[in-house]
Amino acid sequence: MICIIDLGTSKVSSILIDDAAKMTVKAFSSVETQGIKKGSIINIGATSDSIADSIRDLEMQSGEKIKEVNVAFSGEQISSTNSNGPVVIGQKEVTASDIQDALRISSTMKVPSDKTLLSVMPIEYIVDGQPGISDPMGMNGVRLEARTHLVYCSQNTKNNISKCVEEINNLKINKYFFNQLGAAECTLTNDQKELGICLIDIGAGTTDLTVYRGGSICFSKVLPNAGDYITESIAVNLKIPSYQAEEIKKKYGCAVADLASDEQLKITDVSSGNETTVSRVVLAEIVQQALTNILRYCINTIEENGLKEHIPAGYVVTGGTANLEGIKKLGDQMTQSSFSIGLPIINRPQKSDQLIKPQFSAIVGLVHFYAQEQNKEFTFNQSKGIIGQIVEWIKSEL
């Protein structure tokens, strides 16, 4: 059994699978939480309770006792960078040891001393100046270089997660993940990743941005404004409580004012306590402005990092905010590029229909991501191949 927990700002989701390779869902749970803000734990007790409730749901559905979990998270505390690891190999064939050395050097060159490594993802290898090599094993050369994408977070972040999961709930954490890796795994095709594409995952607390090119991740960034920012804009402009703003956003929100009807919605003014009405057009104008700010931030980030010309496949948006009516039209207008909504790609096994929603892209994709890593480890450990050795080294480093 494999259990994955996704710690989101608005919810703690967990999934239990009994066959990762076939994506057979044994149980799934999603529980609201008040203990996380913008991806960071702000209340140990509340977060622990949400985790406990979610795990309890899984155990009741499956009849299994869960002892070990894999934890995925995002948040402003996550950073990333691209790094290089050069090694001199002499005039000989590239060996597993050479590749491990290159990866090790790349993973230690740019990670700040107060951070801890979360993921090491090879972008490409370069042998004697020749780029674009996915597997240099056995090639002849003098100099090998590994180009990698590193994702890291503060040690305190891991400590707080460990406290909620291991100390309070008595569960063992097997692996930590940056949840955006999962979202990309089940919403993007290999062709899109090869050509060059940007994935925008707009959750409740943060917007996660990743770019894939040449089949590999080459850029990632966590941005501070997301679904809660839209909710706050509605609450402030209409002078209503946040919970009511969230409710009407989900039920009546529209990303393009021109698409909204003139239906009148009942709301309660928080200042006077009096009931009043607002049209869906006015609501849509507020939503459109807030979402425009979020997407503009994403587009500017892509342009500022020189990536605009490297994403000919355009943009894919996922996460809970992708459920907003009209978001594709707004994205098309703003990017002047291909802009689509990313849904989890699964084999539609029993109990999984509820997962085919943008808000569950990360946790569904993490199942695929985890299964791939396990398959690599098994296959190459059996043959003592390079990937198995690299996976083993990365696990020991993380």
Question: What are these language model-derived features?
Answer:
Residues 1-11, 15-199, 216-218, 227, ...:
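Nucleotide/phosphate-binding catalytic cleft detector across ATP-hydrolyzing
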Residues 6, 189, 201, 293, ...:
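Extended, folded domain segments that form the structural surfaces/walls around functional sites
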Residues 12, 184-185, 202-210, 324-325:
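Short glycine/serine/threonine-rich phosphate/pyrophosphate-binding segments
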Residues 95, 223-236, 328, 335-342:
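Gly/Ser/Thr-rich active-site loops/lids in small-molecule metabolic enzymes
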Residues 186, 313-320:
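A short beta-alpha structural unit
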Residues 195-237:
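Glycine-rich phosphate-binding loop of actin/hexokinase-like ATP-binding domains
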Residues 317-368:
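Nucleotide-binding motor/catalytic cores of P-loop/tubulin-like NTPases across gene-expression machines
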